[in-house]
Amino acid sequence: MDINASKVDPKLLELLVCPLTKGRLSYDPEANELVSEKARLAYPIRDGVPIMLVSEARKIED
């Protein structure tokens, strides 16, 4: 995978919020996901596009 393709634009990260909680997201570069700690969900990034659908998000387990 191209390393540059997996990076998230910091300006985009400032604008995006969790669709469930409207809270901030953090980027997990290892999993290539946007994480909502409050909702305990991780939204995938596919081909450089964040998939901001709760139905597509992975539940974060402890």
From Swiss-Prot:
Pfam families: Trm112p
UniProt GO cellular component terms: cytosol
Highest taxon above the source species: Bacteria
Cross-referenced HAMAP family: UPF0434
Family statement: Belongs to the UPF0434 family.
Stated name of the protein: UPF0434 protein R03186
Origin species: Rhizobium meliloti (strain 1021) (Ensifer meliloti)
